[in-house]
Amino acid sequence: MTNKVIYPGTFDPITNGHTDLIGRAARLFDEVVVGVANSPSKRPLFDLAERVLLARQVTAHLPNVKVVGFSGLLVDFAKEQQANVLIRGLRAVSDFEYEFQLANMNRRLMPELESVFLTPAEENSFISSTLVKEVALHGGDIRQFVDPIVAKAIAAKQGK
């Protein structure tokens, strides 16, 4: 069995914080599966296919990373991918409680599923997809928070 990990998220859009964690996970694990969740209830800016494409483009330089879209329960996706480790990012103490609940629920649904938490690089610790979209909506410069491919895609979505 290979040392495979899943990094799940909505990635709407994928940020430099996400790509930093993906790159670090790629050094720690044999294979990293970036699981892009459908999450229609979050009313994403980009549809699932667009988010998968953007994630593939910004991780193309990492040979042991693959990007896959999924719907449904994360534990079912983990079983499908034959992975028993998840990575999650913790930006602040405030993230911990929610992530702790998720980890326990996932472990209850799939006892062999472990959650590994990574903290972001300091320069990425405040970046969130929500904040990036908010800054872009109000005409702010998001180029320091996302890959140029993502910045261009956001501008195109906003008709700029």
Curated annotation (Swiss-Prot):
It catalyses: (R)-4'-phosphopantetheine + ATP + H(+) = 3'-dephospho-CoA + diphosphate. Pathway: Cofactor biosynthesis; coenzyme A biosynthesis; CoA from (R)-pantothenate: step 4/5. It is an enzyme of class 2 (transferase). CDD domains: PPAT. One of its GO terms (biological process) is coenzyme A biosynthetic process. The record marks 18 as: Transition state stabilizer. Substrate binds at residues 10, 42, 74, 88. InterPro entries: Cyt_trans-like, PPAT, Rossmann-like_a/b/a_fold. Its cofactor is Mg(2+). Keywords: ATP-binding, Coenzyme A biosynthesis, Cytoplasm, Magnesium, Nucleotide-binding, Nucleotidyltransferase, Transferase. ATP binds at residues 10-11, 18, 89-91, 99, 124-130. The keyword Nucleotidyltransferase applies. The keyword Oxidoreductase does not apply. One of its GO terms (molecular function) is ATP binding. It is found in: Cytoplasm. Reversibly transfers an adenylyl group from ATP to 4'-phosphopantetheine, yielding dephospho-CoA (dPCoA) and pyrophosphate. PANTHER family: PHOSPHOPANTETHEINE ADENYLYLTRANSFERASE. NCBIfam families: coaD_prev_kdtB, cyt_tran_rel. This is Phosphopantetheine adenylyltransferase. It comes from Aeromonas salmonicida (strain A449).
